[in-house]
Amino acid sequence: MSMIMNLLRISKQELENYIQTPSLFEEKLDVLYESEDNDDTFLDIDKAWGGILYLLTGSAFASGSPEDEVDSLNRIFFSAQFFDEDMDVGYGPAHYLTPEQVAGIHRKIASLTEADLKAHYDPEAMSEEEELYPSLDWDEEDFDYLYFHFQALQSFFATAASRGEAIVTFLS
């Protein structure tokens, strides 16, 4: 099985509803999975999340903490903010970013270029990093895969930030 990173844009009101009643988020996922025509509120970045996280933070696995600044890239996929920490939506619980955190992260990633990311791309070091997902022998061609999904991520965050939306992330 592969661990696929999924992102879902939601309104501030939906965020508050899911925090108050986590089962509503499970219902949302059921509807999302049953729909054959997902709209632009849903993004699947496949297995690129580990490599993207490495390029952004220098770490194979980073997660947020309450002490992090609002725009910390450590929390881009794993904010450690849960509707219900015991709710398993695939590979663990869903994490969420508040609209303020989304805006802060957007400001940090919006101007990153291919050259910026390429400067942090070290296939040899990435291949040796045991916690980096997926575990593979990274090479120069793999950068294109990461950059393709990073561009989709940039656009997704830009839309969410411009609309004052929250983002939910989860592995399936």
Regions found by a protein language model. Name each.
Residues 1-148, 152-155, 159:
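Acidic (Asp/Glu-rich) sequence patches and key acidic residues
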Residues 159-160, 165-166:
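A hydrophobic membrane-anchoring alpha-helix module
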